Amino acid sequence: GCLNLENKINDSLSPVPEFRLEIQENTIVLTVYEGRYKPYLYKGKAYKRNDSSTVEVDRLEYNRLILEGCNQTFEEITSFNQQLTFAKLETEFIRVMGIEKINKDILKTLELYSDQSGFNNAAALLADDNQFTGIDIIRFGDTIDEIMDRESLENISILSQLEKTLQMFRKYYQYEKIEGAERKCIDKIPEKAFREAIANALIHRMWDIPASIKVSMYADRIEISSPGGLPAGISEEEYLNGQISILRNPIIGNVFFRLKYIEKFGTGIMRINHAYRNALIKPSYQCFSNSIKVILPVIRENYDLNEA
């Protein structure tokens, strides 16, 4: 029985995974260990568990398995466009780091360029022009049928996307209040929370999905939906507790960290919640298989965030 089963595994699977067969009384116990050489094919096809059934993986998932087997991420793949410019990235590094200009050595240090492969996808995402989708922002009126404003940001640096999204936020969720001789800027939604949510969407989303980050602006809230569910190995509870130790796009995350767009890896949820620490109504989070949604509510009008 064991020999027959072993032969079937060797004949049907490629590459053959590491496994162990044990006989326990009248039962054969088969233990299969996670392999490093993904994807593992059964009669030339890759499969996955989907609830209680087994289904063939689609082309996108198959490509991800190949990358995983090569110990490579999407952002590390060589960019098909090697004629990249970095004016926005250079401006930000001059502002924050005080450098004179960006050169190849700096790009190598940031892991955006190598002599062997040239620029990678992370570099393309940070470049002034690229082929990627970005952020779709809609400001709704009283109903979802009433669109007051819309901006689709794509094919530009994700640094520019963050900046332009913040400009739209300030247009609708900040106002000035005159107190005596002073003008005070009041946030309807904490800007720190919104900035953190957008920065996290950009560095944690799945970039191999041709879909935009959706920013839906309502009178009482903002909803931010980013493509891609939780990284493998992270539970929803760990995510909600701010325990994201697995960074889906570490190269981009490192650039955002150096530019002080984020303070520390994996602390986004905690920082969003901290911005609402004195508010009565709190942010909420929804995790789906292919997306994550962050909902930032407008705080009550007489609550002053600047005093929090």
Q: Would you name each region that the model predicts?
A:
Residues 78-82, 133-135, 234-308:
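Flexible, glycine-/charge-rich segments associated with ATP-binding catalytic modules
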Residues 1-47:
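Divalent-cation
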Residues 30, 125, 294:
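A residue-level signal for conserved active-site and pocket-lining positions in enzyme catalytic cores
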Residues 37, 51-211, 217-233, 237-246, ...:
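Active-site helix-to-loop segments that bind/position phosphate- or nucleotide-bearing substrates
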Residues 35-41, 230-232, 300-305:
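Short, charged/polar, Gly/Pro-enriched secondary-structure boundary elements
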Residues 27, 221-223, 291:
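Structural motif
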